[in-house]
């Protein structure tokens, strides 16, 4: 009969820490490559089609605040555990978890607000009675043009005049682009939703890891001499925060 063997049972704390850090760096690298691929696709796509820019809603600003603040108790949790203060470390992890939940709620609320304004999808019925999902066109979005949103074509913002859209170079307003705006797939909305919810999914893994480590602290499996799991959790959590800061700037300010 085979027996389960803990290959790290006789390893020194230094070896365990290096191993967990290496594994976490591999995970972080994989996530970086995933989001780099998506944002690269966004840059290529933006230059080929009409592209909508939206101003940042209050919900997304709050999500940025929560994710940045959450790194503080996460850092303290690791530091306190190294100092042997288990209960204080557990408290800081609980605060991190609550801030992570707040981030997730505000992220979802931010996208829901954009979706309700027309950036999401519409559900219709097929002849067979099934639900058909259609991503909304650019013209479905509501708000004050030039303030709440604007649409670019070939890198230049369209001009709205008398309810019609025109290229910036069409100074005499002779060739309206309204029909194209009303029918063009809102690719920017689709990519924003993918980035938001993909980040939420990865952050949820960090939240689960937090709960596991809170329980490990509670039952005494983590200590000042065995903090490697919490250290790896901290690496992942800080990375998730940095990743959202990058995505926030990329989506709402850079592209």
What does each model-identified segment do?
Residues 1-255:
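...captures the hydrophobic TM-helix bundle architecture rather than a specific catalytic motif
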